Curated annotation (Swiss-Prot):
This is Curli production assembly/transport component CsgG. One of its GO terms (molecular function) is identical protein binding. May be involved in the biogenesis of curli organelles. It comes from Escherichia coli (strain K12). GO terms for biological process: curli assembly; protein secretion by the type VIII secretion system; protein transmembrane transport; single-species biofilm formation. It is found in: Cell membrane. The lineage of its organism: Bacteria, Pseudomonadati, Pseudomonadota, Gammaproteobacteria, Enterobacterales.
Amino acid sequence: MQRLFLLVAVMLLSGCLTAPPKEAARPTLMPRAQSYKDLTHLPAPTGKIFVSVYNIQDETGQFKPYPASNFSTAVPQSATAMLVTALKDSRWFIPLERQGLQNLLNERKIIRAAQENGTVAINNRIPLQSLTAANIMVEGSIIGYESNVKSGGVGARYFGIGADTQYQLDQIAVNLRVVNVSTGEILSSVNTSKTILSYEVQAGVFRFIDYQRLLEGEVGYTSNEPVMLCLMSAIETGVIFLINDGIDRGLWDLQNKAERQNDILVKYRHMSVPPES
């Protein structure tokens, strides 16, 4: 009877845990947070604004902890591409290629050279137009990455049978600012942050069920929120704040003035700075 009880207990503990994947997942579009849904459902502007983004730098100086790697950075280095995507998806801005500007200029030189010597392809016979200049620039950087901001857990064990769970919160912070190309004036600036959740669940048994017979078993899993998705969410939130702030300060306007009370705009307008925990 005692052996049966132990066996049932182990099965119950293991039943609460997810089974390991049996095959690799198929390629899919990147999952997105609630901030992306808010970004893509903003009310329409009076007109889209040409914007350029050059480089969003990682100013944290943080590297992944040992034993992962001493040379891999703790945060993704793709913040520029994320910001360009967020600006375009908002339907408020028309991003202009600036990160790969040298590649674009080289390609235009090749086309012009082919046009001059008469070997140009049919699709490039029309003279090239001048590149479009931006009305504003969006600058910024990843200004902070703090690991183990908060951690904790809970567990219980009875006669060698038990389970426990632990969690850890990291935090990433981003600064975005809008710059007037004509004057260099910083029109708007915002700091946003996003927590990164990691947790672990374990269960096990360590019990002598008979003389010289030991029952031992462990099951568990860990889940780490991708830093890439958290950075993307922080950038999307920052773009929404910049749009909202620009509306309030008259930098740009809505196509329909009545939509100033749009649910998304109101939510972010009333979002206050959280107190220190």
